[in-house]
């Protein structure tokens, strides 16, 4: 999604509610969730001031899991609509994590915005050993 001053996610943190009701500029089905952008993430998307919303469903065996989220700039991770990671500011590339007990089917949503320059977004999930 493209954003402007009126829909800037830092000034209007609920902007993704509006974005999710609009047609996306680009959709990219992926198997591995890691992106690094020095420019536009896809045709038709500007190089700076863009936002992404990523969703998936998955099923796991019972256990403790570590969810890792790499981001530059802001990112939020929701599991079953519960906010687990909230790094919603302009920052250099960093990794945040949350440890959770899971079993069965779940929904994951990652919201991300890029303010300018380099941008990265990645997600990994691993069992806690």
Q: What residues fall within each predicted segment?
A:
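Extracellular/secretory pathway-exposed regions associated with glycan biology
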Residues: 1-66, 70-129
């Amino acid at each position: 999604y493209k954003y402007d001053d009126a829909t800037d996610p830092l000034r209007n943190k609920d902007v993704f509610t509006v974005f999710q009701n609009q047609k996306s500029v680009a959709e990219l089905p992926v198997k591995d969730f890691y992106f690094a952008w020095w420019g536009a993430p896809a045709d038709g998307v500007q190089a700076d001031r863009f936002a992404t919303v990523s969703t998936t469903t998955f099923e796991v065996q019972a256990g403790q899991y570590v969810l890792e989220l790499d981001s530059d700039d802001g990112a939020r991770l929701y599991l079953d609509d519960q906010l687990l990671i909230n790094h919603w500011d302009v920052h250099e590339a960093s990794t945040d994590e949350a440890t959770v007990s899971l079993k069965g089917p779940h929904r994951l949503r990652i919201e991300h915005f890029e303010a300018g320059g380099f941008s990265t977004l990645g997600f990994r999930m691993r069992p806690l050993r």
